[in-house]
Amino acid sequence: MLRIKALAPLQTRVSCWLLVLQRGHRLASIKHVCQLSERKRQSLLYPFSDLEGHLFSQVNQAQFKIFHPSLEELRQAETLFTPSSKHVINYSTSAVRMDHVPILKQPEVCFMGRSNVGKSSLIRALFSLAPEVEVRVSKTPGHTKKLNFFTVGKAFTLVDMPGYGHMAPQDFVEMVEPYLQERHNLARTFLLVDASAGLQSTDLVAVEMFEEFNLPYVLVVTKIDRTRQGALLALALELQDFIKKQTTACFPQPFLVSSVQFSGIHLLRCFIAHVTGKQLLSAKQS
């Protein structure tokens, strides 16, 4: 099991069943990001740029820039996450079994991770330009037993999977495994990893499942604002090495995000637009 020394995660308790984003983040739109200084803008849009100065010259930085869209491409992706009368973004439905899952034609992306990894906060950040979107959260962390579906117009669907770990429902595997195996329109699975904890044994079980089913997936490091740069760099390098040596279906570049500071959110939006086929980027690998 991989272990990275980092700051202890801050404990967060969710006290209500339904959290509704009342207003968007002040940096939710590219136009506001462009008002920042060049250094702050680069740090926000491409979080790995903050870590580059700490790397030895012999380290290959290209592996962290495989997906590196331009500012204009980030702007284009933002339109996909901006609602309009003809492009409605909202919570659609929930399901507890495969026979309850809606039949949809558009591509899907699903988000998975351990309980309290920051999944709901990340989804709210992605949808921050659509503040009316409802992200449902269990009163007791780790006890969500439903797959929650969010439709982004006719472009794609985002699926919020139940959290796993020692507090997860026992029927997690019975619920999630059939979805991963049978959902033919699943374009990409996003596996969230807490920056303060690194890959845990339960995460490795999920990785084994993705590899067994040959499902394309990507690692997303959450809560990077709570971790020292040295520890974050060590984790990023270890994850990149893990991906290279122990996986075949994982995208080679881990993504770094902070839902609080909004770091990496625009980049992740653009990647989602890319893998769902809604934005074709030049010279980018998927």
UniProtKB/Swiss-Prot annotation:
Similarity comment text for this entry: Belongs to the TRAFAC class TrmE-Era-EngA-EngB-Septin-like GTPase superfamily. EngB GTPase family.
Any one GO MF annotation of this record: metal ion binding
Tell me the ranges covered by the EngB-type G domain, including all copies: 105-278
Output the PROSITE patterns linked to this UniProt entry.
Answer: G_ENGB (PS51706)
SUPFAM superfamilies hit by this protein: P-loop containing nucleoside triphosphate hydrolases (SSF52540)
| Protein name, per record | GTP-binding protein 8
| GO cellular component, as recorded | mitochondrion
Q: Please name the PANTHER family in this protein's record.
A: GTP-BINDING PROTEIN 8 (PTHR46498:SF1)
Annotated residues for binding of Mg(2+): 120, 144
